[in-house]
Amino acid sequence: MEALVYTFLLVSTLGIIFFAIFFREPPKVPTKKVK
């Protein structure tokens, strides 16, 4: 059960950081920056 909680926390933290960086930068070319 602990592994599940730690995995969820890790994923949520990475998601928050990703969204923070994504919304921080001005979306100049969204299609090229996605992949």
UniProtKB/Swiss-Prot annotation:
Taxonomy, superkingdom: Eukaryota
Annotated localization: Plastid, Chloroplast thylakoid membrane
Its membrane topology: Single-pass membrane protein
Gene Ontology biological process terms in this record: photosynthesis
Any one Gene Ontology cellular component term annotated for this protein: photosystem II reaction center
Keywords per UniProt: Chloroplast, Membrane, Photosynthesis, Photosystem II, Plastid, Thylakoid, Transmembrane, Transmembrane helix
Record-linked InterPro entries: PSII_PsbT (IPR001743), PSII_PsbT_sf (IPR037268)
A Pfam family it matches: PsbT
Main subcellular location of this protein, as a coarse class: plastid
Keyword flag Transmembrane helix: yes
HAMAP family: PSII_PsbT
Subunit: PSII is composed of 1 copy each of membrane proteins PsbA, PsbB, PsbC, PsbD, PsbE, PsbF, PsbH, PsbI, PsbJ, PsbK, PsbL, PsbM, PsbT, PsbY, PsbZ, Psb30/Ycf12, at least 3 peripheral proteins of the oxygen-evolving complex and a large number of cofactors. It forms dimeric complexes.
Function according to Swiss-Prot or TrEMBL: Found at the monomer-monomer interface of the photosystem II (PS II) dimer, plays a role in assembly and dimerization of PSII. PSII is a light-driven water plastoquinone oxidoreductase, using light energy to abstract electrons from H(2)O, generating a proton gradient subsequently used for ATP formation.
Family affiliation: Belongs to the PsbT family.
Annotated protein name in UniProt: Photosystem II reaction center protein T
Organism per entry: Oryza sativa subsp. indica (Rice)
Lineage, broadest ranks: Eukaryota, Viridiplantae, Streptophyta, Embryophyta, Tracheophyta
